[in-house]
Structures are given as structure tokens and as C-alpha cells.
A protein has these predicted regions:
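A structural preference for short, pocket-lining loop segments at secondary-structure junctions
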Residues: 1-22
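Intrinsically disordered, low-complexity segments enriched in small/flexible residues
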Residues: 144, 148-184
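Short polybasic/polar patches that bind polyanions
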Residues: 5, 113, 178
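Conserved catalytic cores of soluble enzyme domains
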Residues: 15-151, 155, 163
Length: 184
């Protein structure tokens, strides 16, 4: 982040993590403090920022990379402070209700878009992007068409961010992240 600020380069964060360890050693090692510092740095960074939620985003480490000017998500990406399995285990004392818990948490990319956490969803599969197409590839995230759509989308978003006035962009970023979690 410091280098992006010093050189005036945009910063792209990519979130695809199962999350940090939820144990005593992680807490004693200062994980919570590092997450807090990262959140503060991301919100105040003068450089244009773009976050890509590429796969799973679980825990504070994923949330720490989220406060960007714009947030994009792959169609099948999700974000949660606690994985649905963990939340299900806490709420119901079983992980068998993880799907129901995920639905209630609103962790899917479409839910995140509806709540203003994600700005844009990039379709992963050709049939999702064009309304038709071949069967699901074995590794949809490695599909050339998806990568082309993703690259074009990232390029367009970064160009738009770089064209914005810095003070206006920073004010909008701060306002955006103050609203997250508020009703209406």
C-alpha cells in the first residue's frame, strides 16, 4: 500500500482466502491489530483502489482487503466474517445447516451486490455472460473467456478510478464504508 501511495499507482487487492487461523496463537501474534491497521490504511490510501473478490472471502483478513473505491466479484465468490460452516456450528451446533446459514448471512455475490458491498459481478461461465454456452468447464476460474472478461472489467474500472478527482474519490470511499451494515 505504501508503494502504491508513493508512486501514485492504483492498488488492486484480490480476495480468495479461507481466512486466518482462529486460535490463541494468531491472537497473541497480533492478528487483530494487523487487520485493523490494514482496514485503516485501505480506507485512507490516496491511491485509487480496486478489490476483486475472486473466490471465498472468510474472516477478518478478507474483510481487511475490502475497503476499496470499487469492489468487483466473480459470480460464485462469497464474503463472510465467519464461514457459513462456522456460523452454523455456533448457531445450530452442526455444520449441516451451513447452506441455510449462508443464505441468512447474505454472503453470495448477488447478496453483496444488493447490499452495496459489491459494485459489479463478473460472470464466470460463458452461458452466464452470454445467456448460452458450453457446459461448465472443469475449472471455470481458469476459462480464457472469463479471464478476458475479468481483465477488460478491471481495466475499465481502473481507468475510471484514475480519471476521478482524488479528493472526491477519497470522500466517496470513506462515505461508502461508513454506510456498510446500516439499514436502507
Amino acid at each position: 500500500m505504501r508503494i502504491a501511495a508513493e508512486l501514485g499507482l492504483p492498488l488492486l487487492t484480490v480476495v480468495d482466502t479461507a481466512g486466518a487461523a482462529l486460535n490463541r496463537e494468531a491472537e497473541e501474534g497480533g492478528l487483530a491489530g494487523e487487520i485493523a491497521r490494514c482496514l485503516a490504511d485501505m480506507v485512507t490510501l490516496p491511491a485509487p483502489t480496486l478489490c476483486l473478490l475472486l473466490g471465498q472471502g472468510a474472516g477478518g483478513a478478507a474483510l481487511a482487503l475490502l475497503p476499496a473505491d470499487r469492489v468487483l466479484a466473480a459470480r460464485h465468490a462469497w464474503l463472510s466474517p465467519l464461514p457459513p460452516e462456522g456460523a452454523s456450528a455456533i448457531l445450530y451446533r452442526t455444520t449441516e445447516r451451513a447452506y441455510e446459514t449462508a443464505d441468512r448471512q447474505g454472503v453470495r455475490s448477488a447478496d453483496l451486490l444488493a447490499h452495496g458491498i459489491v459494485d459489479r459481478i463478473v460472470e464466470e461461465e460463458p452461458q452466464d455472460a452470454a445467456g448460452e454456452g458450453p457446459e461448465r468447464p472443469e475449472h471455470p476460474s481458469r476459462d480464457d473467456a472469463f479471464l478476458a472478461r475479468l481483465g477488460a472489467t478491471l481495466g475499465a474500472e481502473l481507468a475510471a478510478l484514475r480519471a476521478q478527482d482524488q479528493a472526491e474519490r477519497l470522500a466517496a470511499r470513506r462515505a461508502r464504508h461508513r454506510r456498510i451494515g446500516l439499514p436502507g
